[in-house]
């Protein structure tokens, strides 16, 4: 089972960026610390308030585990093979850690000594906990495997989404993953819904004009364990960033490069509806169990919310005065967090953590991120209601309820 905190980037395996933990509307910046390198994925938070960051550093440690409730005190750190910053660490409910590096998936116990390491073809995206202690690992070169999370042994069949991949060249196209270009077949982490057993991901096949969506089905206890169910080119301009699955596993939400938000049937990949955003969202939307969708972030975006009404989307509110740089992280029914441009006060520059009401878009609070540079890599919400954000330039900011 995943950790009770914020187990990995975008929260749960469905990439919903939602937690039932009631969010705090008042926050205090408790500590800030640098990873002494860069970050390309958000930090993960464990059930014990531990924080894991997968940094890219010029030397020394790169994978770090800190104590979020003790001023970021380091528990342990180690160095991974570099080049895999796009993969967020994943905590399970026993504080074991899973993280990808080019050519391997690695698991650590609550201490820094490796539990197991297994070779893969490519760079694993953020791994996903399935059922029965099984771990889904999808690499940027399109290899899909399931591992026993305790032993590290492979379970069932693998699925190769790309043909004729050279297994020895496991870093090929890796530089295209961050900007989501054609050289990286699987540039973003998959979404998994336990309710339906569906796994959905974006795939840019070699020679194809755009990235399409692919649906796989997970069959626990059966053979084959994984089957490829469908390929959808409904988003004709191509998909961008990780897809998100609804809580019941029936609908997949994804950004289109056509400045639209798309909803598709998870069972067959056929479109339900699309709605214009009037901007290109570079990070995934956030989705609540009640069907509220908050658009993703990126440069020149706006904060917009929609309600899934079945065969169409209804705009609930739009904030043209707010430009979110990150995916919004939603906590309970009434609180959302996003890193936005500027800050409190007229003419403010830099970045701030915005606290808002997802129901109506109203701003509740805003907290400046001191000396923040680069771009934000996401917002993580702990089960103790602490909120952590970080920047691509490696600065981590931890807030506590005030």
Spans of model-derived segments:
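Extracytoplasmic/lumenal domain signature
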Residues: 2-3, 7-40, 44-125, 129-402
